[in-house]
């Protein structure tokens, strides 16, 4: 590519690299271009949608709109952005499935029932995890569950939800990890994604 620019009069903007699997090759291509000091643009609409922060917000909205069903609750919990760890989410899952827990009201109330084969003393630990989740999403549940609102109002609720969470700090930690590992493409994505999302919600 550099040879074409140097010897044939091409400009970098006139050269395209096409792949049938952007998700697999985008990061590798970005690293190669960075190392070769070649200016580039990657159309990463799909991969950005797969960013854990974006997935976290999509799951949060789906969860609130649909009334906290099992599928969207655990999709949210497994994005890696919640204060509930994935290990803790795994501990909740069997209980939620066994007893059909659905709706924010059920998540906000103390659990006392024990299903067959469950060790009774585990209910205390499950309640501690439940409380973390219930408090984390309380204002989101109240905001989305209290009547129809304008798009602007929903965006404000989401902005407040994001700002009160520790998502920004988690994104920064991931950004540092990618920087340390030399993954410049992912470092850049994690550096920019918070601002991009907040700007969109602000508009």
Set out the residue ranges of the language-model regions:
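Polyanion-engaging groove/track-forming segments
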Residues: 1-203
């Amino acid at each position: 590519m550099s040879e074409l620019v140097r010897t044939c009069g091409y400009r970098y903007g006139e050269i395209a690299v096409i792949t049938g699997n952007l998700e697999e090759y985008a990061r590798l291509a970005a690293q190669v271009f960075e190392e070769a000091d070649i200016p580039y643009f990657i159309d990463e609409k799909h991969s950005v949608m797969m960013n854990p922060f974006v997935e976290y917000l999509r799951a949060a909205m789906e969860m609130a709109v649909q009334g906290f069903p099992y599928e969207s609750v655990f999709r949210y919990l497994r994005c890696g952005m919640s204060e509930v760890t994935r290990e803790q989410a795994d501990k909740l899952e069997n209980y939620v499935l066994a007893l059909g827990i659905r709706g924010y009201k059920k998540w906000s109330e103390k659990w006392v029932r024990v299903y067959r084969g469950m060790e009774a003393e585990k209910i205390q630990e499950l309640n501690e995890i439940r409380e973390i989740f219930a408090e984390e999403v309380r204002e989101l549940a109240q905001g989305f569950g209290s009547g129809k609102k304008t798009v602007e109002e929903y965006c404000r609720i989401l902005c407040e939800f994001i700002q009160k969470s520790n998502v920004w700090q988690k994104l920064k930690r991931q950004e540092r990890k990618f920087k340390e590992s030399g993954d410049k493409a992912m470092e850049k994505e994690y550096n920019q994604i918070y601002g991009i999302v907040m700007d969109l919600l602000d508009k």
